[in-house]
């Protein structure tokens, strides 16, 4: 049974394909036959009805398409419909002139109905109506559509190179696949062909309108001559019969022509969206209740003019007021729900494709994940200062202070996070997280505030320094400021946290790509230095390692000229040793390092006892030996105590060591007390006054 159904289905498909293939040639043969062979009135009625139906179908099709490329056959249909009308004019002219003397029914019921019913049997009115239709079709609709098609064809052709380049750029960037690129190129070519064809096809309609006028004149004159000379009719009889038939013939041809012309205007004037013409008009015309309300007021004022049909104006005024109220109460009442659902369905079910490289999501250098309640903070059109603007400012500030532009910050939502939570990641690894009350303000007690805040303040802690804080509404801001709290917006909390994370992990964000970008930028100002350095002196890898070593210890790399000159000077001797080159660069940047740490204040440092320093120097001199665990713990504990003391005094904790010890001690402390600054004696060589606050190892017995 299944096999029989399958065979039957295959036969039906083949028959449908054969019908579609033969429909065009058959239609052309029928049109040519109508021009040559005499037709019976019934057959003529059949073809006139078909012509009217075709014009209605074409008009509705043009209105229900969402894109012009959905109806690319329209220029060809325009040609066939014009040819069909001309063939009908020839056939009807033949039958009117042959059998017109018999009566108005001799040319078929359709022509008789248009000649008698539509114009009341008055040929004078018929001629006037016919001329008006010709003017509307020829001078208004066709001329406008022709001009739009001409301009559209020109702009489409002019824009083709740019569109092709955009497709190539998207393809190279991996935003689209090869199949999508090929499909877009085909659509561009089809669009150009369509508008080019429409530019020429519009001339068919204009020619059809002109032909209609000439055919009407020929039919009237020919009918009068034949009626008077061949059928012995009086002038008034011949004029009445042949003119009515000619007017009916003209109207039955020109009304479908007007409909098809309107369809061509709809096609070329529409803007391609996900909505058809009707949906576009309704959704855009009734989107603003104020416009409808003002229209109703103006209409009501006009209705008060003496002599106006007040009842009719009142009805339409009331209708406009009602529509305005309806839109105001329910703004989405005229939106295109059907198209939206169709789009969702297509997204979920129709556009499912095989996995490709476009589905691979590479981790960005730095990213922020937001809970679903924090999504409103990234609205671009928000009147408040939004999160995106503040993140841009963070990158600008870091670029200005550090000396290189941090990577772009990728923001995405994460439904697995609590609604008020956000998470900061570097290369896909979670670094820190916090919570934010969207729309509220964070009152931070940095040590100067006097007492807690009243309800509805919600107690929390600052995400960076863990200070006691409160989430408050705008009504409590003045009260919080009076008590000594620092106030921060919701988006400022996240951006400040991000700024802190970037500064404390800046070395992780400085990769080889950023190093190359920095070189490209500096080459605009110091091209000779770049040319002498890379690849003549050192390679990009060593250059990147030197800068990364500086960033690990929070040394800015703004003074690139000094860095490059130092590397060029010492690279011949230490070409492959990034640690030594880093130490030499630090010596050259000594004044900058001191300025950043001490902020032009008194230089207070901690030192090692000379005996302890000698032990450490002997340890690092022997590359195979390691620091004794007891001594290691002693140094770490003592330095931790010194750091805590400096933190209480709000001064930087700086350890001054021998130049050869600096790298070793810095690496050791980086794992335990990363906030201690380790300087070498050569970096402070130009400093005259150094105050030693403590010496570690005074009581150490070696």
From Swiss-Prot:
PROSITE patterns named among the record's database cross-references: FHIPEP
Membrane topology: Multi-pass membrane protein
Signal peptide residues on this chain, from the entry's feature table: none
Assigned GO CC terms: plasma membrane
Principal place of residence: membrane
One of the GO BP terms on file: protein secretion
Alphabetical UniProt keywords: Bacterial flagellum biogenesis, Bacterial flagellum protein export, Cell membrane, Membrane, Protein transport, Transmembrane, Transmembrane helix, Transport
Transmembrane segments: 21-43, 47-64, 76-98, 118-140, 209-231, 251-273, 285-307, 311-333
Location in or out of the cell: Cell membrane
Keyword Lyase: no
InterPro entries given in the database record: FHIPEP_1, FHIPEP_3, FHIPEP_4, FHIPEP_CS, FlhA, T3SS_FHIPEP
One Pfam family of this chain: FHIPEP
Keyword Cell cycle: no
Family to which the UniProt record says this protein belongs: Belongs to the FHIPEP (flagella/HR/invasion proteins export pore) family.
Function: Required for formation of the rod structure of the flagellar apparatus. Together with FliI and FliH, may constitute the export apparatus of flagellin.
This protein's name: Flagellar biosynthesis protein FlhA
